[in-house]
């Protein structure tokens, strides 16, 4: 049998994969990150069906008595859909985010109300992550919200974030949040259902990578070598997953359109790409 690209990248020992997958299934505190493409349609309008599916998936975790924090993109995209045109300047992008963020939160509020759940909005900048006192205040607020069974919905505060204080990417924001709140699992939902050896939208021979661990450098090299902007967009997701794995937290990159995707993770199914702690051990 000929060796595939996935084989050449090296594999994670199955015992390590199974242990990390079990830890992911048993995670008590989960950070879920949803990207813009997981929430909007091709015209950048907020897609009600996509948002409701995300909430349905999160509600399943809540019913399993898990704490869930949602890091949600989509504000600028939702703003474009509401206003009717895109941004040409930083100021326009920031203004669109304010329009879109309010619309996004209104829809989240409505959708979670179907499950008699309340939500709270938290907007952050890089300064909030870097300043110990401010980050501690953020974590304390999150703890209180979770004690009240309220779902924190987190996004970057685009309206006030200048280039110097921008986090720049919600993949990195979700990684920082997961570490800061002592999460047991980070799930990044995207419009591609896993990390592949190529862009699955363009390459029919692209293979799903089941797990990433000690083979991270090869995976990172593969992603960075890609010339496709669509596939290249997964780079920060891979980096964010790697970051939390350094703290003993399993991470999964999976498709937002996958049926019952969070339920599959919570029941130990093999879905998406699993990032195990890089020391090859799962967190105790």
From Swiss-Prot:
Record EC number: 2.7.2.11
EC class (word): transferase
Binding site for substrate: 73, 158, 170
Pathway: Amino-acid biosynthesis; L-proline biosynthesis; L-glutamate 5-semialdehyde from L-glutamate: step 1/2
Keywords: Amino-acid biosynthesis, ATP-binding, Cytoplasm, Kinase, Nucleotide-binding, Proline biosynthesis, Transferase
A GO BP annotation: L-proline biosynthetic process
Any one GO CC term of the record: cytosol
Reaction(s) this enzyme catalyzes, per UniProt: L-glutamate + ATP = L-glutamyl 5-phosphate + ADP
GO molecular function: ATP binding; glutamate 5-kinase activity
Compartments where found: Cytoplasm
Annotated binding of ATP, by residue: 33, 190-191
Keyword Iron tagged: no
Summary of the function given for this chain in its UniProt record: Catalyzes the transfer of a phosphate group to glutamate to form L-glutamate 5-phosphate.
PANTHER family attached to this UniProt entry: GLUTAMATE 5-KINASE, ISOPENTENYL PHOSPHATE KINASE
Similarity annotation: Belongs to the glutamate 5-kinase family.
Protein name listed in UniProt: Glutamate 5-kinase
Taxonomic lineage: Archaea, Methanobacteriati, Methanobacteriota, Stenosarchaea group, Halobacteria
Gene: proB
